[in-house]
Amino acid sequence: MGAGGAFIGLGSGAVLANPLVKNNSISTKGEIWKWSKEAEYYVQTPRGPKCQLCPNECNVKEGEPGDCRTRVAENGKLYSIAYGNPCSANIDPIEKKPLYHFFPESRAFSVATAGCNLACLNCQNWQISQKSPKETRNYELMPNDLVRKASENNCQSIAYTYSEPIVFYEYMYDSAKLAKKQGIKNVMITAGYIKEQPLRNLCKYIDAANIDLKSFSNDIYMRLNAGGLETVLNTLKIMKEEGVWIEITNLIVPDWTDDMDMIEEMCNWLYDNGFDDTPIHFSRFTPMYKLKHLPPTPASKLKKAREIAFSAGLKYVYIGNLPGNEGEDTYCPNCKEKIINRRGFYITEKHITGNKCVHCGETIAGVWG
């Protein structure tokens, strides 16, 4: 992901010289405050500042960061130490997020800081998500520089991604606000574990999001991810209300989230709550982090989940991390013809004009540019 070096690697094989690179880890108190900002959401309590950004509601004591590792207390105030110091930056095809129905074939300038407010046993980016910005090698890339670099590299969007953008909320918010003024879109790839007020304020500047709906069981959410289901469902509803284009990812983890009855319940909930034209990506698990002992998701389970979703009335259902399968492609929900053919993150054939199927004229949900 290009973290920690003098260059940002691009998917095309090119490299981009990074502006204002700091190759050394930010390790001392004096240095870390350069990349800090007072947190937007917290209240004072007798036990110290209490974060109001996510449902964890950490009471942060001086010298002890919050669960996300990006919130620290100083003189009774709460600060984010994830501001202008991304540990990862890259230029990606928007399809990599994955966002299949949002400005297809466009480029996204992708950034992440260290930290996360969940603790997923299967995290694919645990090397940065389960660390503090004090522990990673970081770039210096303040919001105005981030927006400028996105523009210079012909990126139609900035993607807040890789780790969990909620924990670098202030950096994302300020960057997104500047980007919006410059006509650059903002997208976030998130687990959606955030409280309502900060989410609604953020949605003013976010154009699209991929929400990781990790399971449809609160018990599994707690044991697998250290989170909760209801908050994520509320995030989906709020972002839809606020006009953000949404796509959903559901990672099917063997022995954890591969119960087809649960997947059917999830798909029925999505349909019943107006998400029938929201693309859903069933993603293949690969052994990772604390679940290395599990096998990869069988292709048969991914295909079965796709069938269940279609049967529930969902219109755009994809399979991820399984190259060469028909679940990579987009089909018209009316005439059933293939209208977008993909190979990995790249489109090889397209039969859509504007937002219409060329075969039958059906409107295809999305933001097509």
Task: Locate each region found by the language model.
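N-terminal export signals
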Residues: 1-21
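N-terminal [4Fe-4S]-dependent radical SAM core
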Residues: 29-50, 56-112, 127, 338-340
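Short cysteine-rich clusters marking metal-coordination/redox-active sites
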Residues: 51-54, 120, 332-335, 357-360
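Short linker/helix segments within small regulatory modules
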Residues: 62, 345-354
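Extended interfacial segments that mediate partner engagement and assembly in macromolecular machines
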Residues: 78-166, 172-173
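Conserved, mostly hydrophobic/aromatic
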Residues: 120, 211, 317
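Conserved AdoMet/S-adenosylmethionine-binding subsite of the radical SAM
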Residues: 143-297, 305-308
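A C-terminal junction/extension of Radical SAM enzymes
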Residues: 294-344
